[in-house]
Amino acid sequence: MSIYFFEKINAAGIRTHFVSADLGDTTMEVLPAKVFGHGLEVICRHKAVGSFIRRYGEYIEEGADLPSYVETTFKNDEKGDPLVTKDALVALGVMTEAQYDDIKDMTQKITKIVADDLKEKGLVLYDIKFEYGYDPEGRVMLIDEIASGNMRVYQDGQYIDPMTLSKLFFA
């Protein structure tokens, strides 16, 4: 799934670390990239579910539409992947304002690519998680993977687990 989406995203002119892959050798060639801070996760939400509803459930109904809502968290399992704002990321020296703006823009564009592709298969993307890094010039790029385990997808109102999603996607 990662290779499929990285190729689509690259074709759309969005920077990623993906260069090529050989499924036979199970290898992937990628550009060098540094992670932001000690690792950052960027989530784009189309529906109010998961940790979003746990945090804000008194203000919004579960499953309510969200307009490509983007949020960032530090990768830190011990602290429950705490939310972090743009201002905090800049103040802490994790990234520049321009890098944050690039990440948000790229996240919304990539999410649309993935959501549109899933929609063609009768599937609805509720949310998806990405990781970003930057090259030696400081340019933001999508890194890591785009896998079924990084997205929450539904079909006919029912959640599709990652293994089933992979099978449905390539059916």
How would you name each of these model-derived features?
Residues 1-74:
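Active-site loop/lid in soluble adenylation, ligation, and acyl-transfer enzymes
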Residues 6, 86, 115:
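Short glycine-/small-residue-rich flexible loop motifs, especially phosphate/cofactor-binding loops
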Residues 10, 90, 119:
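Short polybasic/polar patches that bind polyanions
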Residues 17-22, 119-133:
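A short glycine-rich, hydrophobically flanked beta-strand micro-motif that places a catalytic Asp/Glu
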Residues 44, 125-145:
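Conserved metal-phosphate-binding beta-hairpin within the catalytic cores
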Residues 55-102:
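ATP-dependent carboxylate/phosphate-activation module, predominantly the ATP-grasp catalytic core
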Residues 95-126:
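A long amphipathic alpha-helix within ATP-dependent nucleotide-binding catalytic cores
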Residues 145-171:
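C-terminal helix-cap and adjacent tail motif
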